Amino acid sequence: MERTLRNARVATFVYFALNGFLLGMWVVHIPAVAHAVGIGHAVLGWLLLLLGLGAFAGMQLAGPLTDRLGARTVVPLGAALCSAAVVLPGLAFDTWTLGAALLLLGFGNGCLDVSMNAHAVQVESGYGRPVMSAFHATFSLGGVLAALIGARTLDRGMAPAVTLAAAAVLGLVVAGVTARALLPAAARAATAEDAGTGTPAGRRTPRRIWILAALALMLMLCEGVANDWSVLHLRDVLDAPAATAALAYGAFSTAMTAGRLLADRLTGRFGPVAILRHGSAIAALGLTAAALSPWIPLALAGWAVFGAGLSGCIPQLFSAAGHADSDAAGVNVSRVAGLGYLGMLAGPAVIGPLTHLVPLNLTFLLPVAFCVVAAGAAGILRDPGPEPTRQGVRPRTETV
């Protein structure tokens, strides 16, 4: 059993890294694909919304399927779909084909995202201690690997279609080879259906899950703000050189990855409530410092603190959603991930119009407020069951 669980954990790491790698390969090729298709920033912005809509649709489908068929079936299928779709933007020849390609890529990403997080919850249940944050850190590392490879291939003049095709083949191979190491479907889910209680997908989503989803929306909006506006903040507000301004996002993402590598150990020691409460508070302080600082070094430090504070928060929400009901883990994770993803997409849409009313740096007080709300609502992570544990993770059960 221990070897099976250990192999499943390694496989989950692989799928998270693969997801980050595939999305990262698309991101680094966005300028080249947009130039090849002949579209400007405005049209590209609308097309990227299709990526998000496709992901949201995939998440809502993958959640019930994961509960019905098990993550062992849905994760490889989602990974294969995401891998096959990553080449499509490189083959697009006009706006319509690029839009269709992004819709399919988003759909595959959504299917993989929810199913692999549901499997991560299953692995975490088997270990009886927090392991979710490390999986999310591996996703970030996959994106870093994609950035390094993509930069190298672009520098050598390779066509996006060629590089993305190679990434697709690699993803398909990895998805197939790793599938056997995943855990089988939980026995309890089949028992519940046989007893006539109905499928998990047909149940009413508890209020606690919607609260977790609302917190995910707010905190992932904060992450989206950093992704889209941190560099512009240093460049346009503090007049930093382009190379220096780029360090803002680098500081944020590096601190977030490092924080997630440490978050599981901290969660095991202090509990998920403390991680969400103090992490959100630290993030609020960091972003406030970045927003109000007239000095570039302090602003960079603020963005780094913002990333470190946020790093452990989202994994706690995903973990709590998955552990709330083992028979409906996929559906519950899809609710939290779906609204969270919409929040990340809403970041640019919310901040942009606000800049017509106040300076860019003052618009960051909105995500600061969201962090404060998350800190105040951290108690929602307390296990409502009769036997809560300090880690907020149920002890090993027959699901593994």
Predicted segments with their positions:
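Symmetry-related core transmembrane helices of the 12-TM Major Facilitator Superfamily/SLC fold
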Residues: A161-R180, F364-I380
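Short amphipathic helix-loop junctions that connect adjacent transmembrane helices
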Residues: V28-A42, D228-T244
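Pair of pore-lining "gating" transmembrane helices in MFS-fold secondary transporters
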Residues: E2-H29, H35, L103, P206-C222, ...
